[in-house]
Each structure stands twice: as structure tokens, then as C-alpha cells.
Amino acid sequence: MLDIKLVKDKELDELWHIHADTQEDVENARPFGANLELWENSTMRFRKNDNSWWGIPGGSDAVAQVVKEGWAEGARKVEKVLGQIEPPRVLSSRRKKSRGPTGDEIDMQRVYAGSLDSAWSCMKREDGGKLRSPMSVTIVAHVGGNCHRDAEELFWSGACAVALARALRNSGRSCEIVGMFYTSHTTDEGKGICVEIPLQRMGAQTDLETLAGVLCLGGWFRNHGFKLMSMAPERVRSSYGRVVDRIPQCVKDKYTGAVIQITGVYDQESAKRFVQEETSKWR
């Protein structure tokens, strides 16, 4: 499902916040009528075998295949550069059965007895009084870029998210990952656009190749990101606006607790520094 709202941001008067629940929602949707030609031209114009735009040979068709099957080469690159950086493992947590109105298993005896508020059960982690860092983390990564950014530059923000997801998984924590992109002066009316899509739900199994195929591959954003922006119900400028390297308030407000925000990372050294600084906070 797509959710399109006009919201206010503290630095921009108004912007269109476009949220997609899944990648399939983006694939099945059509851009706003006034933006259809712009989106078709932007994808067709670069459909040639241009690695600097798509990130891999074969154009948008190859990108679609990688998004579906995962990107082993991208995952290996992340592992080689950022894979040695780890937060400490969680050793003091334990799991305890918890009952409530939702969960993983249902007790039919409680259902028949009318105790619906405690009929479901699931196993939850307990701190035990020794943990210094949260067990669940949200990673919000600014993963896009306009035409002046090549695929190698777009790789590194996503690489930070993949490396942190791997490190959090290996240390016994769970995370959700959200990809977003934010521009100002994007429509003819002068409004900005922020697009947002969840790429890994909290508690889901972390598949590094699948994550690399969307977060690190410039072509994923060229296909999905630009298409999402074209769904704004106003005419979008051909430049797709000016990139704003921060997370807007409308996205920040949706995620509470431990949140890692990734913005302005466009090269290998910046990615190393960012991941090292973030993992050092978990000690």
C-alpha cells in the first residue's frame, strides 16, 4: 500500500511524504499522470549498459534480476571493507515466555475460557540487568542521489546499513531497516519530496545479499526511488530537486527507541568511520 501525505518540515514549508509498505507496491503502481513521461524518459534514457549509473552491467533489466535474487558481489564488497567491525555480543540476555492478546502460539484452553487477553504466547528477550545497549535497533539510511552521484558513491550509505545489520545480527540483536531519500524544490510548486520504504522488518532474518541488492545498488534507487518520487500528485521537475542530506521530521517521528541515521556517506573511508563510530556506542 502507498501512503502519500503533504506534511511540513522545519526547514521546508511543505513536502510530499511518500511511503510504500513493500517493493511490490512500487513495482505495481504507476506515476502521477503529469510525471509519467518524466519517469519513463529517466529510465529509458539510461537503459543502456552504463555501470556508473546502474552499478552493474545490463541496465534496468539486470537490476531487476539482482533485486529479486540478491547481489553476492555487493555483499562480498561490504564484507571485505566493513565486515571486521563488530559491536560486542549480547551475553546476559535470556528468553522468557510472555502472554498477551497476540503472539506466536495460541492456547485454545484460554480461548475457550474467555481469556483472550492472555491466549497467545511468545518468547521475549529479558535484559537481566546487565545490558548496556538496546536489543532492537532501527536503521534509517538515506540511499539515493541525483544524476551527479554515480553508483559507486551511492554504494556506501547502503553498505553502512548492511554492515551494521550484519554486526547487530551477529551480536544477538535484531533490527529493522528503512531506505529513504529526501529532496527540496522538487515540484513545480516548490514543494520537496521524501520517499520511504521498509526493507527489513524488525525480527526478520537478515539476508546480506538481498539487502545489498537494494541498499547498495545504485540501480535499485534509479528504478524504485525515482518512480516513488514520480507519484507525488504535482508535476515533478526534471532534475528531481536538490538532495537534502538529512532525515526529515516526518520520518524521525515514526521510529522511536534506538535509531541509527545514515546520511552523507558517499565514499569508503566515510563508511568505515561511520560504522566504527556507531558500533563503539554499543559497548
Regions found by a protein language model. Name each.
Residues 1-69, 134, 145-151, 155-159, ...:
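Acidic, glycine-rich A-domain
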Residues 44-136:
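Negatively charged sequence features
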Residues 142:
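Residues that scaffold, gate, or flank divalent-cation-dependent active/transport sites
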